[in-house]
Amino acid sequence: MSERNLPGGEMSSLILDFFWLADCSGSMNGEKIQTLNYAIRQTIPDMRKEADDNPNASIMVRAVKFSDGAAWHVPTATAIEDFNWTDLTAGGVTAMGMALELVAGELRQFPTDTKRLPPVLVLLTDGQPTDDFKKGLDELLLTPWGKKAVRIAIAIGKDTDLDVLEQFTGNRELVLEAKNPQLLVKFIKWASTVVKNVSAPMVGDAAGGGIDVNTIPTAAADDDEIW
């Protein structure tokens, strides 16, 4: 575990694991996947600033992509200071359950120590699972860190299964409906900022613990409604 030299002596750094879970199915082709790629790239400077402002927590980022199957897009936990985003392309179906299983397998390897903050999982999708979503979710929630995780879902467009996403988040307020490109960018940027809340001293086991839902962005009067 990394340590940082701080004024007043050496102090162990807490680890905050951040996971993007991105739908790359065929229905995401075009503006949706382009906007997703753009928005995630835009989050990087703000997340780096948050890491600078909170030297007691190390933000480590991973990413999963899912379509016909699920695979690591960023397989190695990468410090936000070194993190870069490679654009995704779209095609295939929506193996959301497999994506959750992949993350569950990673969380299962985490030690149950006090040097880790609850992980943040951000799921982005525009459709419905085409595989066994419940199996994947059950595996995730059976892991101690999966149960403690702050789980946020961003529904892209009007065809997303909101009930499925609420099962993932455990909190309807953390299912964000992006009906246009402007809202998708706003929601992705907002989701990246929850690291500030999670790194606060008190975070409960419940999904969304410590997150101020009043800060979730809303649509502007001039936003398009095209999805």
Task: Enumerate the predicted regions with their spans.
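Acidic, low-complexity intrinsically disordered regions
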Residues: 1-227
